[in-house]
């Protein structure tokens, strides 16, 4: 079995989007998205979009529980295929809370989603502070210092944040933007 290339998956998803609306799917749009999910069950953007559209669309001849079961399966598949990404976990958490009346599971999914998003934010901020620090212009050093202050408040225990902020402060002091620490 040959696997679809990424550009093919994106093109098929674009064609499916053009066959309907973002707020209520056409039968052709749902068919195209389902075919893509069948052909590439790990393509998370399609799984999430199909699940979202199914929640917004009343399909003729499909009872509510049947639709909810398909949506739940798609969301669980998206969570698994995405390596438990924050967006997929968040969608499953909302679904579980609203449609499955399972507050304990919903809470755990919301917490896992938040923790995943925070890890991504911490790493993104550390990378951005480091990038700006390495640019070594007054403007980028000032941006690094400003973001560093926020990052330290949000992630006070993060060794990575503490390291890049300390480096930014050292370079800013050498550039005359901060008083030098004379140890």
Predicted regions span which residues?
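Terminal, low-structured helical/coil segments at or just beyond the last alpha-helical repeat
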Residues: 1-4, 139-183
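Short amphipathic alpha-helical segments that mediate assembly, nucleic-acid/protein binding
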Residues: 6, 26-30, 141
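Alpha-solenoid helical repeat scaffolds
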Residues: 30-34, 69, 76, 111, ...
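Structural marker of alpha-solenoid helical repeat scaffolds
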Residues: 39, 81, 115-117, 154
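Amphipathic alpha-helical repeat scaffolds of TPR domains
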Residues: 2-18, 39-60, 83-98, 120-134, ...
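Helix-adjacent hinge/juxtasegments
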Residues: 64-88
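Short coil/turn connectors between adjacent alpha-helices in alpha-solenoid helical repeat scaffolds
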Residues: 15-25, 55-68, 96-106, 132-143, ...
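Long amphipathic alpha-helical scaffold regions
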Residues: 74, 112-121
